[in-house]
Structure formats: C-alpha cells, structure tokens
Amino acid sequence: MTQPVALLDANVFPTTWLLDILITLDEHEIVDVVWSERQHRDPERIDRFLDSIRSMNPTHCIYGWEPRETLLDELPDPDDRHVLAAALVADADYIVTYNLKDFPLEKLSRYSITAIHPDVFLCRMLDRDTRGVLDVMDTVVSNKNNPPRTMGEELAHLRKLRLNTFSDRLKSLYSE
C-alpha cells in the first residue's frame, strides 16, 4: 500500500503535540510527511525542533519549488503560493493546515491536492491503518517523560488543539 504524501503548512509546526504525532506517523510509514525550507523560517520558535528533525530524513524537506511559485496565482494569499508549489514538487496528496480558507477546494482541484484540517487528516489515517495509528499513539505517549503523560491526558490535550473527532475516536477505540 502506497503511503500518502502530506505537506505540512507552517501553522502546524508550532503545535508540537500535533507535530509529534505527524512525525511519528511518518516514522511508522503510515504517511510521508514533507515541508519546504521556507516554512522553516515562518515561526521562529520551532527552529530547535526543526533542527532535530532535519537530520531524520533529508527527503522530507522539499527543494526546487521556487520556479513554480511564480506560476501559481490561484490562491487568495500570495504568501501561500510557496506551500502549493512545494506540494506540487513533492507530488503531495494533502496540504495539512488549520487555514483551509487559504487553500480553496476549487483552486486546488486541478492539482489533485486536498487541503485538509489536521483533525480530518488524522481521522483519515486512522481509517487507513487503525492498528498503525494506535501503535503511533502508544509510542507518542510512552516517549513523553517531561512530564510523563497518560493516554487520557494526551487525548484531552488533543481536544485543545481542535482535534476533537480524532481524540473522540481514539478514546472509543481505547475503551473497547
């Protein structure tokens, strides 16, 4: 089964709890997570974290998107053209973003790329590979030591990140 490719918008990076899940999904080969170097420059507070994950797999950072950016004028915000350009170069299936309004469906449909809220994206991955996502969540929780966290605490925090459906579905699966 081919992994979907998901380009992460810059607004996903500051949320390290979400990013931890997405990177671990990638490590478990459930999804191929990518980003562009330009996105690294957006929120300064993520630099240390990005430095640690850059070495993980150099193919996660997409290069060579710059020439395409100038050809893309479909998006409402010109500052988001680089995101679409990088997604095209990566042959991404998804742009994972909290700002869906910046990536209108009618503008992306010609490229076969879907802008998707992180909650919906995680639910799709859960549908695609339930056991794999549960393993990822177990790994994420067991790796959190400072402070240690229970699955219940993790799920409660995911709700604060507007990952309500994903959190509810996980809670249901863990109660079975």
What are these regions (language model features)?
Residues 1-20:
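Metal-dependent nucleic-acid phosphoesterase active-site entry motif
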Residues 4, 30-32, 91-94:
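Short active-site oxyanion
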Residues 16-44:
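PIN/NYN-family metal-dependent endoribonuclease catalytic core
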Residues 30, 58-59, 112:
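A generic structural signal for alpha->beta connector loops
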Residues 34, 38-66, 140-162:
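PIN-domain endoribonuclease scaffold, especially VapC-family toxins
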Residues 58-94, 128-129, 148, 159-176:
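Active-site neighborhoods of divalent-metal-dependent phosphate/nucleic-acid chemistry enzymes
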Residues 83-113:
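Acidic, metal-binding active-site segment of PIN/NYN-like and related structure-specific nucleases
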Residues 101-176:
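Acidic, PIN/NYN-like endoribonuclease modules and their adjacent C-terminal/linker elements
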